[in-house]
Amino acid sequence: MKKLCLVTYTRKNECYTQAIDLIAQKLNEDFMGDFKVVICCEEMIHVPQSNYEIDIFLKKGTKYRKLISLMENDDSLYYLSIDNDISGNIPAIRQFVKKLMCQRVDIGWGRIYVDSPHGLISNLVGVDKLLSHNLIRPTLWSLGVGISVPGQIFCIKGGRFRGNLINLDTFLDDLALGLYVNVNNCKKYIVNKNLGYERPNNHFWGLWNQRKRWAIGYGSILKGVFGINNYRWKVIIHGLGYHFSWILNWAIAGLLLVKFFPICILYLIFLSFIIVGKNLKMLPYAFLYQFIFPLFHVVWMISLVRFLSKGDSNEYYS
């Protein structure tokens, strides 16, 4: 039994990254060896030599299913889940894990931002990340209807989740995990600090296809829990908050445009400031985001309708 297990996930042609190794080295120092890394993968990969324990867990399927299966076969006290493509803010992660354990909570998370965006698409993704992590997610959780956990980095108490998570086969682990946390009133530790950076989509079609995948993942969760009233409405509210709020924004802007054009522009600029906060270099992209990014929400909506119309009403929950 280890006190902390860092879990990461690799797909085909991916390797254990130096960024994850650096995080692991520091955490191993903090826990004086009461620590290990588990790499969840579908086929054997090369494991570098290290001064801490590294195990391979072979499992096919989604990241969510891999995490569930790992906990069924492992007895670590805490699991720090980090995506393989994340560059960690190591001082923040170390402090986050220590405080989480001291407070004896069930789950904790922080914020994730985009790593060095360049070009229009990646900067729009960066704005979307700011909007999600700084505004939408905190607001929904504060209202008691949040179900989204940053899937890139989170830490959970093994005994609270082992054998208890909703048995969904979805690649949106952030929603499946967050839904369980909400419905079961798990104790949370949420920090406003940035815990890491992820590489953004740099291409139009890459982002387009990502939103289609997200719609299918969301739809699979909605189908799976549709028969449970408390679950169903929270999943629906999440979809409305993340993918339909732009409609309200356009409606307000449209009303102001009819009344007085400069007021409409000032409103959009003001909202851009709210989204980016202190990250003022993103301000121009936040303004453009309000006009361009709704296209990708429409792609999400259409993909969701197509998926739901297939009529496969399989119940994935248990």
Question: For each predicted feature, which ranges?
Answer:
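Long helical/loop segments within the catalytic core of UDP-sugar-dependent glycosyltransferases
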Residues: 64-66, 90, 96-163, 168
